[in-house]
Structure formats: structure tokens, C-alpha cells
Amino acid sequence: MASAVRVLKKEELCRPELAGKSAFHREWMKEYDSALLRFIQEEDAEGFEPVFIGWFHVEDTDEQIPRYLKKRREDKVELIFQRLLYPEYLSGEDRTLLEKYLREHMPYGSRAKEHTVVFDMLCDPSTEYGTDIAYMKILEKAGCLTKETISLLMEQMEEAAAEITAFLLKKQAELTKGNDYFSEFEL
């Protein structure tokens, strides 16, 4: 409910009188999911309002736009992770769309040339995304962990928790199993 007010700004979703009643919970979550999907599908620059700090120099907006886009993309990924972490009443179709967004915004994804916000958030040691195994499991279910992305993650997450390193090594071994030349000679 906090994310509905914080990011989505949909007043009709903030109805505390319905949130506690189990009969309306499914309906509320469907409304939340549709608002979340609309937010994710919006252009990243949507809603940008330049704030002129100096004497209305162009440099002011040149610095503001990249920061705004980065924050907006991070908000989208944060909400996707949050929803996939707590998937109660999440439809299969909505799950597919959320997972697709994650896949597209990883290295080697279809939108990777624009940015790799998911990867950047995972590699930032100041966030929970690179330190909690739950997010790696979400990426695994979404199909984001390929041989290439795991190698990049291992390089960038040098000081990752042992649990995450073990998880990534295990996943990498699963993906390369059968592709190893020497495995043919094992007994």
C-alpha cells in the first residue's frame, strides 16, 4: 500500500477501509497490479519537470534529466522486485510482463543498450538487491540469469555474500553442464 502512494500516485488505490477486508483484497491487488503495469510501461522521461537551480542555464537541466531517468528506472525495478517478492493474487500474465521487464533491462537484454538498471542495482553494495538471495531467486525465475550475466555479476559483485556467490556458482554450473568437453571423460 505504501508503494501505491509513494510512486504510483493513484488515489483510488489508497482505500484503507478496503485493504483490511479479505473480500476486497483480491480486487484491490488487481487494481494495484494494473496501475503498476501502467507505471512500468510509461516512458522513463514521463513527468519530468526541470527545476532551475541557477540562472536558468541549460546545464541545470542537462544534469537533472539523467538523474531523473535513473531514479525513475530504479523505482520501476524496485516495485517489480517488491511485487514478485510478495506475489499474492498476481496473475500469470502480469507476472510474465514484470519478469519480461527485468529480462529486457539486464545486460544482453533487448533494452540493454539504453541502460542496465537491474544489473546496476544488483551490483550496488549499498542496496539490499545485491545482498539478499531472494532477489537472485526472482531473477532466476524470470530467466535473467544466463552464463553471460552470471559471469558479469560474479565480476562486479566481488564482495557478495557467500550465499549469493554459492547460488550464482551453482546456477552457472547448471547452465554449463553438458557443454564441458571434459565431462565426456568422467566415469
Can you annotate each of these PLM segments?
Residues 91-108, 135:
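Repeat-mediated protein-protein interaction surfaces in helical alpha-solenoids
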Residues 98, 132-140, 161-170, 177-181:
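Ankyrin repeat structural motif
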Residues 18, 80-86, 102-128, 140, ...:
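Ankyrin-repeat boundary/"N-cap" motif
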Residues 34, 41-45, 57, 86, ...:
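Generic surface-pattern signal
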